[in-house]
Amino acid sequence: MTFTIAARCSRTGQAGLAIATASLAVGGLCPWFTSNGDVISSQAYASKRDGERIYRAMEEGRTAREAIEVPRIHDPDIDYRQLLVLPRDGDPLAFSGDKCRPWSGHQIGGDFIVAGNVLAGERVIAAMAEAFRGSETYDLGERLLRALEAGRYSGGQALADGTALTERSASLCVLGAGEERAVRLHDLRVDMHHSAVNEMRRLFEVHKVHGVYADSRDLRPDQTPSMVVFEAEALRKGGVFASRPSCYR
């Protein structure tokens, strides 16, 4: 009950993943990120063990193609799994087991993978791929989120009888480039919500503002005001912080 995009940005060198599902707390279940900034997802009948197997293999220096084969050797239920591996260098790879619930499948582009299971149809991942390809001028986080939104608007999750399922959790992670390829520029999670993709959009817009402040605390602590002062000024200006939760009770 999941749709996912893992992608690299050729313009910035960043990489990341966005995922949404009817299950809860997907950000702690499916995605993995190596110290080299490689992106992994283990989903469908999700196995943390398979995700960890791929992660460990890549940390040990195996190629993405070698790493994605490790669960297929050790997991007797591999046909229930869907696996995505997006290395920083090299071809993206994916596997969709024969026993994943329909509609299930994946599409691989030069710098991305879109995949899902228990979907309204192949049109869901096709729309995600089109949204990603058509947004090259935007930052990677925006492109990933647009792809997720396109998947939802194209039917999202649905049972075989056509019953639609809502997305109750979502996750968005963007990793840096170069020497900071393992640094998480965005690491956002919606663990339980009646409309997780919409909530992720709200959270993303707020984090774009708050993230600038967080970067200032990291890089220029001697020039950065306290959070209380920052949020008071942000609330005064309005914008995305208007009517949002703040550190004030």
Give the positions of each predicted feature.
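N-terminal nucleophile
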Residues: 1-249
